[in-house]
């Protein structure tokens, strides 16, 4: 969980999420508050949409920290496909190899291909970066990311491929319809399938 120490310092985009908006918003927050630590916590699919903005971070030496929650999927799209279409997935996997299948709590081989390789891409933009594949290594990696507040840094955190994101709001719903966890999601799916029969 994420604990906030200062009120009014946690910026969310609201709902529905806008893929690709995390890094540009973080850059804006850093320019407006150069003395503050700014961390973009972004999904791999979302970052892919505006990854070229790392050039802005390097060019202007904006110390934006990018933490990529990398499960090799367009995660929210996959989650909706599982919910609405009984797991029939289309065009939501970001690689043709399902190589990321272990939790961040389990060590995976360093040689496993991760696509795209955000560490190599960051290097191409002259932005320091590293990948974390084990929960045991995460805390030290975060410390390294935060060590120099004036330099941009990317931390690629490999997580379980099937990790779901909560809270979520169902299509056509409002904040009153918010789904907070997997049990609520599974109950909502059952109700939807009963209401709509075999169409979903």
Where in this protein do the model-derived segments appear?
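Thiamine diphosphate
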Residues: 2-200
